């Protein structure tokens, strides 16, 4: 292969690789190249066959379209070369593509069978015969597989298919109201539906009807897909037209502004000078206009024009102020000059010595951090933070400006404690101890959020008369006092509730020493009737101890509420800070039943003191076993 042939083949291959969609311009270009360079026919054939073998299944059909166009428009020797391997290419492609592409391949093959101008088929007869036999076997096999995959036809199933086809046809008829074929199709479908309802057809007849309905349904789907593609192409064309119109408008605006500038320069050139010859002034104006408007390469947007106007105003104002001596110019070795040099300011050029020094200097962000740390360190110099009168909490210091806070202590606050809690805003330092405190603080937030959000179903219970109305929510109930008393607030320390080091944590149920073991052991069996009576009926038990008993709400409880069998009052769950659990306060559990501990205590006392003690105990047993 010589150099010219190699260049042509490379061009052909590069164009062929762009054929990833059904593009008529690309196929036409390939056909023209094949027609103009018949000496390279074998290379072109090899390239197309390689493209069909290696490209994606979705793109194989487009390469076949290029093959078809070249053979129909150019003819020999391409038809001879392609006939050698046509059957294998067609067979492999047919087995890989989907049913829609297979239908298009079959339609293309039917066109190959039609005789051309010489009265012969497009390709050799042996290759076309092999393809025809293959398609017969493949269609028969496909028909069998399709029939095997289809469900057993029944009248209700076919009626549903007819309804689907009717809907599709009606949608098409809305867009094409004058189409007589669609109207006839709707009429045939309605008649077929009536016949299926009237007569009892055999299974074979039902299968034939099913296959015909499937074919019609696939055709309608194909038509709808093509219509959707057509609409998408129209939308793309509209977008392109809009973009072109916008570009044209911008170009028109540009030409209008250019014409205005040109007319202005012409008028200024044609003006009669008051003194002397105007040749020098015209030359200066021409050079000025050419320098200002001669190198415009594109159209500027309105925002850019406004930005330039504002920058010009600022520059003019700065120049006028500097000319009046109202702007302080820092000396050459000042920190401002050094800062601008390090940042690469355009007004400050660096010599070789300064560039070498700049390499040894740290980065600007690090220098800013060092400067801020120095400000924070010297912020409290000569300031007694605890005894300063300007820092005392009073109305005067709050309403008036406080220079010590604004100029000194703010630097100390944000530099000495740079790490801020994203939830509450509390600040922490960079030391290891401060980081540990921050982690404990975040753990405390996690525990609080877990309590607030919760994962159990809770209930807001409302009682009207004797009816119990419950509404299930996903947010736990918060039972706590909003404000502390003065003495509690003075003695309050954040670390006691935010730290995880303290043993007296909320999740430790054994921290409460005032509650006896019978209150903590909520799941203990109290089957022994005598032990319950001795515990609750003891003379040494007082009312506070009885009311202090509680039961952890079981996981099986959905509404977190129960009704006391004795007083018929509804008890709802509250969150216990000390145990970290949802509990029913003033409650005991007896044989799987829950009672108010005070109600149970009073009932047991009354039954023991009564003359008919056995009857009272029997009544209590009934309450327990209900």
Swiss-Prot record:
GO terms for molecular function: mRNA binding; RNA polymerase II complex binding. The keyword Hydrolase does not apply. It comes from the Eukaryota. Residues 4-139 form the CID domain. Residues 1-130 are annotated as: Interaction with RBP1 CTD (CID). Signal peptide: none annotated. GO terms for cellular component: cytoplasm; cytosol; mRNA cleavage factor complex; nucleus. InterPro entries: CID_dom, ENTH_VHS, PCF11-like, Pcf11_C, Pcf11_CID, Pcf11_Clp1-ID, Pfc11_Rna14/15-ID. CDD domains: CID_Pcf11 (cd16982). It is found in: Nucleus. Residues 263-286 are annotated as: Disordered. Changing residue 66 to D: Loss of interaction with RBP1 CTD. GO terms for biological process: mRNA 3'-end processing; termination of RNA polymerase II transcription; termination of RNA polymerase II transcription, exosome-dependent; termination of RNA polymerase II transcription, poly(A)-coupled. Keywords: mRNA processing, Nucleus, RNA-binding, Transcription, Transcription regulation, Transcription termination. Present with 2800 molecules/cell in log phase SD medium. Component of the cleavage factor IA (CFIA) complex, which is involved in the endonucleolytic cleavage during polyadenylation-dependent pre-mRNA 3'-end formation and cooperates with cleavage factor NAB4/CFIB and the cleavage and polyadenylation factor (CPF) complex. Independently involved in RNA polymerase II transcript termination. Binds RNA. Seems to bridge RNA polymerase II and the native transcript and may be involved in dismantling the RNA polymerase II elongation complex. PANTHER family: PRE-MRNA CLEAVAGE COMPLEX 2 PROTEIN PCF11, PRE-MRNA CLEAVAGE COMPLEX II. Component of the CFIA complex, which is composed of RNA14, RNA15, PCF11 and CLP1. Interacts with RNA14, RNA15 and RTT103. Interacts directly with the phosphorylated CTD domain of RPB1/RNA polymerase II. This is Protein PCF11.
